Amino acid sequence: MKYLSFFILSLSTYLVGMHHEKLDVVVFAIDLEIIENQDSNARDFVSRITNNVKDKEPQTLVYQYHFSKKENKVFLLEIYPNNEAALIHMNNFLGSKWETEFVQNFTIKNFQVLGNANSELKKSLEPFTKDFRSNLIGFDRVADQLGEEISKIK
């Protein structure tokens, strides 16, 4: 699991370093804890919300929950090609049954937003985090080779 987490964090950092004009990736890196006695509910919720995001948010590039062996710690990785796609996700989430169930099952321990989050996205994330880390230095070979195809995902 450590290697998988390292790979995922490396990939997200790698994607965040993109400097492709059409791609300005935003990453949500979220450490969660399952609320006591909510293990089975949390797993059921994760399955349902993942299917919902996959069906309703085609621009979401990555949406993955990673459970620890003890199942009380969870890492949620979300990757969006741009601010607009991240905002679509937040607009679908805020005030919905998904948000209600999320807070019934999880406590947010750490939430970092990686990438160039605009003011509108930052405002939508205010209830959850104030930890925004913009791109400073980096490169991305994936963006150089696949950036145009990724940006065409609708």
What are these regions (language model features)?
Residues 10-74, 81-91, 104-154:
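Short S/T/G/P-rich N-terminal loop/turn motif that feeds into the first structured element of a domain
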Residues 97-102:
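Amphipathic alpha-helical coiled-coil segments
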Residues 1-4:
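Positively charged n-region of N-terminal signal peptides that target proteins for export
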Residues 6-8:
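Short helix-onset patch at the extreme N-terminus, typifying the N->h transition
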